[in-house]
């Protein structure tokens, strides 16, 4: 069993890399559907397909990228080559919102879809080796939670800042030019953060090098697919990813059509993300006290409760709704931290040579995340279409029917509550944490000498 403590000089840059990832996930997740329907006049179902189809393609590519990452590790001793390639996602991020003048409706949808396919592929080249890093390191059960705790705090800050900054940069009733300026500014921040993340990965590998994999390993995907614990964990996470991406896509609509002011999107994002930042260190302590699985189930139940309160709509009053969104944010922190720190546990328990399969496991995991990114906005767009929502351009004023307004509200609240209930049932099938949290020699899952250090707390390894 290992007692390695990861130094802050490595944890900081590694966590910083997730800011770039957070911008790519958050800004399109929060604004792309709205950008298509309310700026480019793309009908809701077509707009949903623009997000769905590229992400379906992405699902197929992620396991392949995972295999490439494992091959790089075996041949070169690191996964950084793909990460440098992935930094080019910044170009796709800018192009996504820099739609050529005159393109509206279906032609604009085609432009966005093509760029989104390229961007998702480049993003996976960075994301897959980045998230494989914890499994590559010679660290224990609690240190994995500590590592992902740092990462979770920083990515949540990145999501908060980008989610709040983007609406401020675009303003009220923005046009394509406003979105392009926003993409240029946030794209520059993406690039700086992602390069820092590569530095962090290098330092982590120096601090806790794992067992070098043997070249020619070819069983990672099959082992991952046959792993019952991994399947249970991934199925639940897929449902969570669908739910969270639906919520992100629905926020601008809920602010504009239910609360009456589009600018309240910034307030909702802040109310969601700020508690998530503050709650992450507490969830690290919860994981140490009662285990990751129990903490995750409690967070999922809290999310269901908060969604049901939001279903009351504007009649509940803005303070109550903001409080409910804050509950969702605190639950979101656990739903990011716990599963991502459980994946390396599963890999460690999968048998000898787990490091050589980490990219394959992570590729399948990020494929599930990409599926959630596709199905969440599409599910919300389907709700809008069923309610009779009418698309428009930025300079048009469209009055929505009562059915469309009901779809805006309940698609944002009751549908996520139902999906999260399904996620809870799937998550209960995961049982590895019972063994990991009570001690299991030979799996590298238990480390009695480890002290969990929260973000910002001094470490004797620095």
Predicted features by range, described:
Residues 2-444, 453-454, 461-462:
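Membrane-embedded alpha-helical bundles of multi-pass transporters/translocases
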